[in-house]
Amino acid sequence: MRLPIRAVTPETESAEIVGWVHEVRDLGGLSFFLIRDRTGIIQVTIPKKKVPAEILDTARSVSRESVVRVRGTVKAIEKAPGGREIVPEELEIISTAESPLPLDVAEKVSAEMDTRLDSRFLDARKPRVRAIFFIRSAVTCAATAFLASRGCINIATPKIVAAATEGGTELFPIAYFEKEAFMNQSPQLYKQMMMAAGFEAVFEIGPIFRAEEHNTVRHLNEATSLDVEVSFADHNDVMELLEDLIVHVYDHVAKDCSEHLAELEIDLKVPSKPFPRIPYAEAIEIANKTIEEKLAFGDDLSPAAERAIGDTVGQHYFIVDWPTDIRPYYAMPYPDRPEFCKAFDLMHPRMELSSGAQRIHDHDLLVERISAKGLSPESFEFYLKPFRYGMPPHAGWGLGIERLVMTMLDLPNIREAVLFPRDRHRLMP
Amino acid sequence: MRLPIRAVTPETESAEIVGWVHEVRDLGGLSFFLIRDRTGIIQVTIPKKKVPAEILDTARSVSRESVVRVRGTVKAIEKAPGGREIVPEELEIISTAESPLPLDVAEKVSAEMDTRLDSRFLDARKPRVRAIFFIRSAVTCAATAFLASRGCINIATPKIVAAATEGGTELFPIAYFEKEAFMNQSPQLYKQMMMAAGFEAVFEIGPIFRAEEHNTVRHLNEATSLDVEVSFADHNDVMELLEDLIVHVYDHVAKDCSEHLAELEIDLKVPSKPFPRIPYAEAIEIANKTIEEKLAFGDDLSPAAERAIGDTVGQHYFIVDWPTDIRPYYAMPYPDRPEFCKAFDLMHPRMELSSGAQRIHDHDLLVERISAKGLSPESFEFYLKPFRYGMPPHAGWGLGIERLVMTMLDLPNIREAVLFPRDRHRLMP
């Protein structure tokens, strides 16, 4: 029975392990291998004069990153990783790696992002890269459990759609048999329809597709969105839910992923609730104190502005009370000052993580807002119909999983947080 | 504070509820409403002479399926649903439904599937329909927790891809900027690449897209697939994992979703392990005993054959030891009898739920099998490359979530198990 490498301790007597050859060293009478599996690294030491000839032959022929099986005696040895090594009684090459490798897994030579992504299967063998994706897995699993515990129903909405969420821009067209269709930008309209269906609280973790021309370190053309929508709730209610989720997920990662965090040399601080709520008008004032290109009321926040505010606030925060004109048509205006709306962004000091709002649930107001945005209510009929048959008040948000992971782990490029990024130029592997 | 309707008991003194007007009845001096939220139904009784005039006015104007808020005194009353009713002190219409409704939510008139799907937001208000999707949510959440507890890493693989998984058929083309791309049929190649990346055990729950022309009660063009892949495992190991998952999920639903199961009048039997393993050759013999169109060795199983075998076996079972020729190129042939391979299907008595196999991990054998299928190894280079740099032995499967829910809940049409189906003719809503 194979043991995970982490389970082999200095006290273990004998062990069988499988893994990849991380390093090979030859010191005259001794050969050393480092063998790596997803749980850790162990040294295999071959005293050339003491092992059977066939083990020596195999050891001589094995290349780095080949997959091997080793069975042998475990010895405590202070200098080795984890304070133990294996002296093999059996050594089998399960799968041979060609040389040279297209990428250095032992990270002695650092590679450009494009080179890394071209050989992502090798890149992701690096313990630091693996740590990111194991943490990402912990994030999505913890978010699923948390939202289910809060009574949210896990839904799956279609990714092939006939209409755009927010007008016709930034859509990838699909040939759907004899019809034209699009890859969905957002589950927005569908999760709202599930409020009309009386589901009351839903969530989805799934892909979204945006044909943005931007090719930056924080944009992807295919990303993973965590979407939530709750009935009989306003923007304040769902901001609290979002805040609770963020804190829960950070806390879970801090407790459950300590080895991966150590691998990344990250001392994860769990943010504390409540996050500050900063009105939009105040946010641009804060930004204008330091940024070069001053913002006027009604401007969207530039990346420079986001950084300036983030530097001032120094933690997660919400920007609230946005001008209605710069938010999507479905954001609910304040009844007493309709030039502002019940929309919010959740910000990490580095960038925006999530957008949300209380939504308009009144059919006629929604039609008015769609028209005011220069869109045609006719093309939204499938979405508008539910608003005529008992749509409850509701609110929700969408949270970018890659941005959440990127900011949590202080990654410089969003591509670090997705296994196989899709961007303006990359469609492979 | 609003109470969920289920939480209002005959012992409750007073309560505020929100919900949809399920039914309205007028009996001279008394008006009755049934109000429905996602947790249940409650009767609201209005003694016309005893309530304030404004409540009476509101009650007279309210239409079925409008959203209302009711605050009042709770009285135990045997004949009412749940043995209690509310006599309102406040009654507010939150959102008015137009009349007539495009679909009858109280299910007095049953509707055609197409009519139902055209107004899915109303259809899903029916307690029976809601029950299906709340159970589906329990299934995906329980599967996520189960697989995480078994050490599987939750991954997200791209849905926009440059190449087909199994040749060029049944793909939806996308215009990806200036390039042609496709919507992915299956995470197969990507989850295998994550085995090369040393992740050792992964899972994904996500959409798959198949441009099949079939328009049957068990095909969808967009479906949800639960995909698993495990390294250093063979077909038997992953069949056990799949079996454990099925039993776990059934058990979870049986325990956690008793009200939804009652709504569907389903007495859920948790299948018992191990499921029978029936070799393909034996399976066609069983089928040929009863079916009209006899199968020859090397034929795929027809729906009639699946039913015939299912009737004989009477429970979940595996079909194993398939002819290599009728399985995908990546299925591992038995070394001692390469005309058979280590592939399997998990069957419910009604239909196939899952396909899996130990995969080929040897590069040259894989190239040979791709060519033997009439495909070009050159177009699979991005997939083949990892096999040259230390690909471990691995096995896995893909499980259709809709089919799992459909068979669990004895639904006649797979469209019952997906909120917004996409089929040969349907792209809306």
Swiss-Prot record, chains A, B:
Its cofactor is Mg(2+). Its EC number is 6.1.1.23. It is found in: Cytoplasm. SUPFAM superfamilies: Class II aaRS and biotin synthetases, Nucleic acid-binding proteins. GO terms for molecular function: aspartate-tRNA ligase activity; aspartate-tRNA(Asn) ligase activity; ATP binding; magnesium ion binding; RNA binding. GO terms for cellular component: aminoacyl-tRNA synthetase multienzyme complex; cytosol. Keywords: Aminoacyl-tRNA synthetase, ATP-binding, Cytoplasm, Ligase, Magnesium, Metal-binding, Nucleotide-binding, Protein biosynthesis. Mg(2+) 3 binds at residue 352. One of its GO terms (biological process) is aspartyl-tRNA aminoacylation. The keyword Transferase does not apply. Gene3D superfamilies: Bira Bifunctional Protein, Domain 2, Nucleic acid-binding proteins. PANTHER family: ASPARTATE--TRNA LIGASE, CYTOPLASMIC, ASPARTYL-TRNA SYNTHETASE. Aspartyl-tRNA synthetase with relaxed tRNA specificity since it is able to aspartylate not only its cognate tRNA(Asp) but also tRNA(Asn). Reaction proceeds in two steps: L-aspartate is first activated by ATP to form Asp-AMP and then transferred to the acceptor end of tRNA(Asp/Asn). This is Aspartate--tRNA(Asp/Asn) ligase. It comes from Methanoculleus marisnigri (strain ATCC 35101 / DSM 1498 / JR1).
